[in-house]
Regions:
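Basic- and aromatic-lined ligand-binding clefts that recognize polyanionic substrates
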Residues: 25-44, 144-199, 263-273, 287
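Structured C-terminal subdomain patch of bacterial secreted/periplasmic proteins
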Residues: 27-28, 81, 125-142, 148, ...
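Extracytoplasmic ligand-binding site segments that recognize negatively charged/polar headgroups
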Residues: 59-60, 102-106, 121-136, 169-188
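N-terminal hydrophobic or amphipathic helices and topogenic motifs
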Residues: 1-28, 34, 38-41, 90
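Short beta-strand->loop
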Residues: 51-54, 76, 95-99, 120-125, ...
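Solvent-exposed, polar/charged alpha-helical surfaces in well-ordered, non-transmembrane soluble domains
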Residues: 37-41, 84-88, 109, 131-135, ...
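Flexible, glycine-rich surface segments
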Residues: 180-224
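A short, structured surface patch at a secondary-structure boundary
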Residues: 28-89, 93-104, 194-198
């Protein structure tokens, strides 16, 4: 078992590789975390990725940036994945979430006893974490220039977003509630956009919060398995909220301020942050 652990992402552990592959970039990558998948697809040729952490769903092409790129790639959440199937694809790099490391031998015995280099990643919790993660993955796949370009573009976009967000008067700060399906990156995006971000898992907490804006993820999961995704799913969720009479007094619902929005822990954070900023403070973008 050859592996590298990246804890807190900002602290790098040197990449460990066997003598046979130390000078060659990985060509057959298995990547489970979606945030890492988004970065990797932005750095390497699509054919270098042979397995991802979700199945392909055509309805999600507009909601997950890498969905169409992974159309011809095998994939499933780690809970439903088949180690032997994955190993039969002859991977030369496995990328997993760090929370899987403690029980790695028990949950993935075949991976554990293989010689495939494995990288464990903590989910990024800040913009700096995302930057460091992009640089790290760029080094591992031997695309440092592409990683630096990706970082510079993201920093430029985030600077523009912060410039607008910092102009928001305190008394105009909006409350945005993420309802239903959670996202570990919601708070990060909310902070960037200068909104009061709240997570409301159910209708009762939503009624108590009475947010100005409600956002829903455009997909639903069950234990990591993608159940549904896309515009029709989002539309059904919004209609269901709007038709619930007990919630009609909520500011966001009475004003029709309900939106489907994805949140990213990758270079795509700039895209979702800009969209949330325009939703929350449209007057700052009027011509």
């Amino acid at each position: 078992m050859i592996y590298c652990t990246v804890c807190s992402i900002c602290v790098f552990t040197p990449w460990i590789a066997s003598a046979d592959c130390s000078n060659a970039p990985p060509q057959r990558i298995v990547v489970f975390p979606l945030y890492a998948e988004e970065i990797i697809y932005g750095l390497v040729e699509p054919e270098r990725i042979i397995y991802v952490g979700h199945h392909y769903a055509e309805s999600g092409i507009d909601d997950w940036p890498t969905m169409i790129k992974s159309q011809q790639v095998a994939g499933e959440c780690w809970e439903n994945s088949d180690e032997e199937e994955i190993l039969s694809l002859n991977p030369d790099l496995l990328i997993l979430d760090s929370y899987l490391q403690d029980n790695f031998e028990e949950d993935f015995p075949a991976f554990f006893h293989s010689t495939v280099p494995t990288l464990f990643l903590d989910s990024p919790k800040s913009i700096d974490d995302i930057i460091h993660l992009i640089i790290l993955l760029g080094d591992i796949v031997q695309k440092p220039d592409a990683a630096l370009s990706m970082v510079n573009e993201m920093i430029s976009s985030m600077s523009s977003i912060r410039e607008v967000a910092n102009k928001i008067p305190t008394n105009e700060k909006k409350t945005v509630a993420l309802f239903g399906e959670p996202s570990i990156f919601f708070d990060l995006v909310a902070n960037v956009c200068n909104v009061n971000g709240l997570y409301c898992p159910d209708e009762q907490s939503l009624a108590v919060a009475n947010p100005d804006i409600i956002v829903l993820l455009p997909y639903c999961m069950d234990g990591g398995f993608l159940l549904d995704i896309g515009k029709e799913y989002s539309k059904d969720c919004i209609v269901q909220l709007e038709s619930e009479s007990s919630l009609s007094r909520i500011t966001a619902i009475s004003s029709g301020a309900i939106y489907a929005l994805n949140f990213h822990g990758s270079q795509y954070i700039a895209d979702c942050a800009m969209r949330l900023l325009k939703i929350a403070y449209p007057t700052f973008f009027s011509d």
